[in-house]
Amino acid sequence: MVDVDSIGSANFRRELSFTCRTYRNYVCNRITYGSIVPPFVLVAVDPGTIDTIVETIDNEHRLRIEDGLCQVNTGDWDGESNIAPFEEHTIYRGLYQRFVDGDEWENTVRFQYAKGQIEQFGSFNNYESVESFRAIRCEFIDELYESIRRSGYRPNRSDTHIVPSIDIRNTKYRYFHKLEPLVAIDRSGQYHWVDGFHRVTLAKLLEIDSIPVNVLCQHPESI
């Protein structure tokens, strides 16, 4: 899972830390709980049947992606206040406007959100201008949609979803964006999305019936 070409870089250190934490989680939780989803094993899900998101905003109950896969968390991360409808997220709403309603990117809520972030903070996911976000990120999403529409959904580990080099998903957060979309399994056994919302949204819009995911966390009551 480690990219040897980036040895010595911050990206490599993040990836190494994530991988080590994943295997530590697996060993400790396998001993404690007996049976959890093994590290980096893919689980097939129907994206149309998972309609909620686990919030990962900075609060005391949030899940932490940087803590690795194979987490077993007994906290209130799956409480009602931390669960949100997937279709209310700006990524889903914006991509629906783009690919179902046929709107120009500039008229979508996702583009307007990115524009607001750039104007307020000077950048958004490493894009320092609205023009670069439109020319690079939005074009990439258009191409990804067409690729999935023509050829079906292919696993990310086959390097079919390589994001632009400038994008934060290919720099600071590369270590987990190389994975499949992330899910968490709550205490009742229900799946919730954690990350990978663009790929999930496109799969939903194109009515793909099965995609691979990685499990970030399970509640012990689901094991």
Show which residues each predicted segment covers.
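Surface-exposed polar/charged interaction patches
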Residues: 4, 10, 22, 26-29, ...
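Compositionally biased, charge-rich terminal segments
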Residues: 1-21, 65, 72-82
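Non-membrane alpha-helical secondary structure
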Residues: 4, 8, 12-15, 19, ...
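A short, basic-hydrophobic beta/loop patch
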Residues: 22-40, 49, 55-57, 71-93, ...
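A basic- and aromatic-enriched beta-loop-alpha substructure that forms the phosphate/nucleotide-
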Residues: 60-130
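Generic detector of well-ordered alpha-helical segments enriched in charged/polar residues
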Residues: 17, 24, 28, 51-54, ...
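Short alpha-helix boundary/capping and kink motifs at helix termini
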Residues: 106-192, 216
